Amino acid sequence: GDTPAEERFRTDVARAACFAALPTDWTRHVTVLAGDLSAPDLGLSAADRATLTAVTHIVHSAASVSFDLPAAEAARANIHTSLHLLAMARGCPALERFVYVSTAYVTPHRGARVPITETLVPLPAPAAELLARIDAGAPDAELLALTGHPNTYTLTKCLAEHLLVERRGTVPLSIVRPSIISAARALPFPGWIDSTAGFGAFVMLLGLGHLRAVVGDPEAQLDLVPVDEVTQRIAHA
């Protein structure tokens, strides 16, 4: 949007209920930089890039979570941004950890009760080749049929994992794969959530009475994970 990054932080982030228990001056420890992850050098000024070389930890959680973006747009949002950030990370000599927040759904559906391992998901072709096909305008239906992914979101998150691992060099990379993130179990307080994305909207519609019944499978498992457990895992990745 047109609202400056610093202003959005002050009005939308700093006032969030999840930070209410922190000291009143906690924001003095936060430096907001205006940039663009989709641009080379993250769209940052030379001075801001120099500032970032001192960071010790990078958490990359930015992404487009839209399931129906054209593959080329999803790749710009989820793959190229990740590679731009990795390039910046290589210039951070004090870096201790680069955490990439992925998704449990990088593994396409393979039938009931097939174990999902903490390894890269096999691809039908090298990740760089698949990305080149996306950038060249290959039809979405062709890409999804080839890889088994149900949508361009999971496909591009999967390719981002592969390319980060392949190109990380000496960057200390960790990947965290949460499933559907939902309300907090304990922190900042039980039930806290500030987003209607994902399961939050579903619960809100049920609670308000707008959604009275849904077709479901009583044997199916709903893959939800509390947001505070996800943040703890990211912090210790």
Explain the meaning of each model-derived region.
Residues 24-30, 88-95, 160-172:
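A structural motif corresponding to the C-terminal end of an alpha-helix
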Residues 1, 35, 58-63:
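Short loop/turn segments at strand-loop or loop-helix junctions that form parts
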Residues 1, 37, 103, 178:
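Active-site loop/turn elements of alpha/beta-hydrolase fold enzymes
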Residues 2-8:
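Short, charged/polar "capping" segments at the starts of alpha-helices
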Residues 53, 57-62, 68-76, 80-155, ...:
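Conserved Rossmann-fold NAD(P)-dependent oxidoreductase catalytic core, especially the SDR/UDP-sugar
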Residues 114-137, 152-154, 158, 162-223, ...:
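NAD(P)-dependent short-chain dehydrogenase/reductase
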Residues 14-57:
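Conserved Rossmann-fold cofactor-binding substructure of NAD(P)-dependent oxidoreductases
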